[in-house]
């Protein structure tokens, strides 16, 4: 038993351990009071940061070399991706030619040049509620038809104001349209998208076809959007696909006194010496949708645009892209409002998800027991990029 007590350490060992601990504390205090030691520790802490770039700086040179090799591979991936989008553009051009006969037929129906056959105009709703409502209304329709038999049936040509109605329905476009633009847009008969020819730089043209009118002589107004599908040499990792980089409009041949993009103002001037007053007139720019055909130019001389100009140009690019991707391919659905309802439902769904998340967070603050760990995660909304 005595041997075991000695091996386990006696009072003398405890005293020695306490003395060592005290000495260690004193030594630590002395070290921490040394300004040079504190400076070295602070420098060490400053270098250890949670930001990725700071972390990379702390890596050995050999590891940094391998990371540079990975970046080289990433640049090569970006160039392959650029080629992929170029081929996608070629496919878009190919299928645009297949769509065009259908769009030409659409124009004929809209303008009234061709009347659709019974087979072409037959449309069966998939909405049961609409079908039921249609059935309930049959008798009323029959009665109404009998009452209208004595009255000449109105039958306007084609679909009046088709494209103007789309402009009015779509917020992005209606914001551009002034009251004095409306009579002109009622003459718009068609909008087409034309892609650049094979082997030419990527671009597309929006063609706005107008019937003869009292405002300008051009049968077609055009807007060309130039695109780029290659990584930026200065920042190759920012590449995310083709982007619109510039656009060109066209000259509108306005008839006398019909140019809505300018307005005439009168200004009185007083002569300093004689005190006489004269009235002068001058033209100043006027807000109008038709300024769309006189766009700002992207800076090509290395000088950056001011913030307002950059915003205006970016908005222009967005509108051009929207015409190409949404309005022209799905025109009838924007005319009826169905496409707009789909867009609104999509946005409301996103807002609902945010509200639900906020509600969950509040619940966690009040009572953690209400948290359901098996709740399915909210899926991110799908986003389409250019």
Swiss-Prot record:
Keywords of the record: Acetylation, Chaperone, Cytoplasm, Nucleus, Phosphoprotein
InterPro entries: NAP-like_sf (IPR037231), NAP_family (IPR002164)
Keyword Signal included in the entry's annotation: no
Compositionally biased spans, kind Acidic residues: 339-370
Transcription found in the keyword field: no
GO molecular function, one term: histone binding
Motif Nuclear localization signal per record, residues: 265-271
Entry-annotated residues carrying Phosphothreonine: 51, 58
Modification sites for Phosphoserine: 5, 7, 49, 53-54, 125, 304
Superkingdom of this protein's organism: Eukaryota
Alphabetical GO biological process terms: nucleosome assembly
Residues making up the signal peptide according to the UniProt record: none
GO CC terms: chromatin; cytoplasm; dendrite; neuronal cell body; nucleus
Modified residues (N6-acetyllysine): 105, 146
Described function: Acts as a histone chaperone in nucleosome assembly.
Family: Belongs to the nucleosome assembly protein (NAP) family.
Protein name: Nucleosome assembly protein 1-like 4
Originating species: Rattus norvegicus (Rat)
Gene for this chain: Nap1l4
